[in-house]
Amino acid sequence: MFEVKMGSKMCMNASCGTTSTVEWKKGWPLRSGLLADLCYRCGSAYESSLFCEQFHKDQSGWRECYLCSKRLHCGCIASKVTIELMDYGGVGCSTCACCHQLNLNTRGENPGVFSRLPMKTLADRQHVNGESGGRNEGDLFSQPLVMGGDKREEFMPHRGFGKLMSPESTTTGHRLDAAGEMHESSPLQPSLNMGLAVNPFSPSFATEAVEGMKHISPSQSNMVHCSASNILQKPSRPAISTPPVASKSAQARIGRPPVEGRGRGHLLPRYWPKYTDKEVQQISGNLNLNIVPLFEKTLSASDAGRIGRLVLPKACAEAYFPPISQSEGIPLKIQDVRGREWTFQFRYWPNNNSRMYVLEGVTPCIQSMMLQAGDTVTFSRVDPGGKLIMGSRKAANAGDMQGCGLTNGTSTEDTSSSGVTENPPSINGSSCISLIPKELNGMPENLNSETNGGRIGDDPTRVKEKKRTRTIGAKNKRLLLHSEESMELRLTWEEAQDLLRPSPSVKPTIVVIEEQEIEEYDEPPVFGKRTIVTTKPSGEQERWATCDDCSKWRRLPVDALLSFKWTCIDNVWDVSRCSCSAPEESLKELENVLKVGREHKKRRTGESQAAKSQQEPCGLDALASAAVLGDTIGEPEVATTTRHPRHRAGCSCIVCIQPPSGKGRHKPTCGCTVCSTVKRRFKTLMMRRKKKQLERDVTAAEDKKKKDMELAESDKSKEEKEVNTARIDLNSDPYNKEDVEAVAVEKEESRKRAIGQCSGVVAQDASDVLGVTELEGEGKNVREEPRVSS
């Protein structure tokens, strides 16, 4: 049994309007961007392309397809995606229009507008306009291409050649309504060869055309009209006002909704195929097949990676691929544009009560096509036969793209399809356009020069529009100045002073200030050679330096001043070693020199660290350090981290207490600041747990004591009640004092026993409380000891 769904939805079919259905389906796209809600019956009819035949039989607007004579309902939003308005008038279904256009391109000719119209239609049109039937075709073309005999000009001033109706713009005084018909039949969806150059129906184009036609002779008018008609027939050719720089991208890719497939009305525009006529013709010619474009997908970084799977749009996969009911899927054979057949695994992954369709095993195919992230994979189908074809289209400026920077179907850059060689037509190669005056060009004179406003010598066909990109380099790791490798990069102030040398050509001026001689120079200092000074056992000092050419060590006087660039030739102090070919000093002396240099460096580094360690904190810094470090303030830091560079040394936050990466866990006997803090926290935590446990025990003891006291009182009251209600003992003498005293003593002893039991419980509880107090005191002493020691 089907469950009827009711709610606030209502079927958007005007002849239905139901609010309850078994299943709600999606229909035609609305102006708001959403899809119409249809009931199960209406939605099924819409998906089967039988909506108008079932619900709009008696409505007006029915016409026949120009090619297959199929009845089409024009002007209905439900059949909008299944109808194509032909360039030469009339309507056609999407399948016939696409196939007819491919056949025209295959023949390599583009017949005129009137040669493709039926003779009956042309004769009727001439009769209605009052034209004589004997007019030849040349007369028709000799008339100016005008529009405006239509009432739509009042409401659509931005369309048409409205100003061409003026008497100045006509040469024969006749009007041609065929151009108006051509304007009426402008396709709702642009054809495959429609370009994005200049709209010939724009008002600026029309105005400039009128002004230009005033200055040309009647003999040239026919040629101008011929070129204008050619522009209308072949919108894919570059427009006359398009500069040569944009000629390469004049044939832009415009997405067209698919003509077939289940739920094709649900496909988003970014998945619509964007083939050009040349690409389809090239692929069809290579494979000797009739190709029907289906959809395309821009590769993401994961699609082009080594994972080996291509994520497909859900609507496209369900519309054009075989239906699958199991998650494992089925093997699917797809052929590429070179004719090679690939076998992929077509499956889906459950995802939030939905499905994510993927093609697995696509890595070899993508690698053979040499695709990367940002390129586009296209899917087509062979008609007839239904075989799937997989093509590709590389993105322009692939080197400038970082990852997948393009969205699906929104690329405005020029692209090239694999296996397709596209040669954009040159503007200068058209003989008709060359006869059009400059006024029709619509470009300023400075941009209409031979160099197009550019530099002389530049080839305008090779000039490309540069894309503004920002090169993002690899992330540089932060230089850790405290590492052992970077220690060698440190330079103390004394070493920097040793590198500064006075200019050798300048003599100093000696000034005495407070009995101290100071040398003053007029020229700035120069950088000298870095050397090592050693001391002999006799106390004599020597200077050692390396040659920049042979890297050999040379012994020099201690007062020698070397330039920044020093070689053995400059060694004027030792004639035997003034050449790079001279042997070096003994190895033993060199080892001593290098050892002295390393010890000197280490000693200076140790002195600087000792000076830093001697700087004890004071004031608030000392209190903060004592609170954090405790009694380990003087110990060196063992496990430092650079995760929080602004944190104080010894910070015990959750980030800084983590051990450094790659060094593992600390030993149990580790006494660093982090481990001490963790141990102290653990000890405090255990003391708190023990204290809480003792408190719970005391509470339980008090509750038990109360219960015992209540029980004793109940027993006592019961005994008193029994005594009061007891029978008279005939064997006892009420006036016998001994019997009365014995009964009283027995009662007193029972009362004392009850009191003694209660006092024992209280004493035990008091001892427990005393133990808790002692533990608290110990914890307090443990916390106060680090502060006292600090």
UniProtKB/Swiss-Prot annotation:
Keywords: Coiled coil, DNA-binding, Metal-binding, Nucleus, Repressor, Transcription, Transcription regulation, Zinc, Zinc-finger. Gene3D superfamilies: 3.30.40.100, DNA-binding pseudobarrel domain. The gene is VAL1. It comes from Arabidopsis thaliana. Interacts with SNL1. Expressed in flowers and at lower levels in roots, stems and leaves. CDD domains: B3_DNA. GO terms for biological process: negative regulation of DNA-templated transcription; response to abscisic acid; response to sucrose. Residues 234-260, 400-429, 446-468, 689-737 are annotated as: Disordered. The keyword DNA-binding applies. Zn(2+) binds at residues 547, 550, 568, 580. It is found in: Nucleus. One of its GO terms (cellular component) is nucleus. GO terms for molecular function: DNA binding; DNA-binding transcription factor activity; zinc ion binding. Residues 694-724 have a biased composition (Basic and acidic residues). Residues 685-732 form a coiled coil. Residues 295-396 bind DNA. The keyword Transcription regulation applies. A zinc finger (CW-type) spans 538-588. This is B3 domain-containing transcription repressor VAL1. Residues 405-429 have a biased composition (Polar residues). It comes from the Eukaryota. Its main location: nucleus. Transcriptional repressor of gene expression involved in embryonic pathways, such as LEC1, ABI3, and FUS3. Repressor of the sugar-inducible genes involved in the seed maturation program in seedlings. Plays an essential role in regulating the transition from seed maturation to seedling growth. Functionally redundant with VAL2/HSL1. PROSITE patterns: B3, ZF_CW.
